[in-house]
A protein has these predicted regions:
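Beta-strand elements of repeat-based all-beta scaffolds
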Residues: 1-225
Length: 225
């Protein structure tokens, strides 16, 4: 659920002794005394530690943790986009959000929210960075989970679009990636093309229509030579 650093640091032996024959159960909580804004109870504080630094927090199953974000929750809430995958009503058993805290300012953190289709494929991620800027990525997947296309918007702290990126992938009948087209602000920037040998290993890669080209050879062990 979460990771944190405690000072003074304890030896592995001390930690094993402290946790021996103990069962810690954490659950969602609307209020708690430690780390406001985390969204979980906190029952595994180590004894004799006088300072704690929260590092990461993970959320699962649903999106009830978004209340933590207050007014920013509207930017992180799911929004459908035409031509891209739709989020399924249930995310049971899936990672739905992460918080990663700034090591220099423990009051700041980046948060990412994950949305999935009915097959468990990620179809949308919405991130607020430590700087306050946002990054939204939309994806369309095939039945095998391969990403057919994605579109990423980079927004400033006020929600204004600054840069957009789009990626389109093509696969062969075996599900191997054969081509990727990448564009910035709807202007084609570069493309990659891939070929494979009879064993399914990549044999060549070209960029920008062959402007840059690489071939791969393998020995009997399957290592690139």
């Amino acid at each position: 659920l979460y990771t944190y650093e405690a000072n003074p640091l304890r030896s592995p032996g001390d930690l094993r002794q402290y946790c021996k024959e103990k069962l810690f159960v954490e659950e969602r909580a609307d209020s708690y005394t430690a780390w406001p804004g985390m969204g979980y109870t906190l029952r595994i504080l180590l004894p004799a530690a006088n300072d704690y630094r929260l590092l990461t927090v993970n959320y699962y199953d649903d999106y009830s943790f978004l209340y933590i974000e207050g007014t920013a929750a509207s930017q992180l809430a799911y929004r459908s986009k035409e031509g891209y995958g739709a989020a399924y009503s249930s995310a049971k058993g899936l990672l739905t959000g992460t918080q990663v805290f700034d090591l220099t300012d423990r009051s700041k953190y980046a948060i990412t929210v994950y949305y999935y289709d009915e097959y468990g494929n990620p179809v949308q991620t919405r991130t607020r960075h430590v700087s306050g800027d946002y990054e939204m990525t939309y994806a369309q997947c095939d039945l095998s989970g391969n990403i057919l296309k994605s579109y990423t918007e980079h927004l400033d702290s006020r929600g204004r679009l600054s840069v957009s990126e789009s990626v389109e992938n093509t696969y062969d009948r075996s599900g191997r990636l054969t081509r990727t087209d990448y564009a910035v602000n709807d202007s084609l920037s570069t493309d990659w093309r891939y070929e494979y040998d009879e064993l399914g290993r990549i044999s060549s890669k070209s960029i920008d229509g062959g402007l840059t080209h690489a071939k791969y050879r393998y020995n009997l062990q399957g290592w690139i030579t």
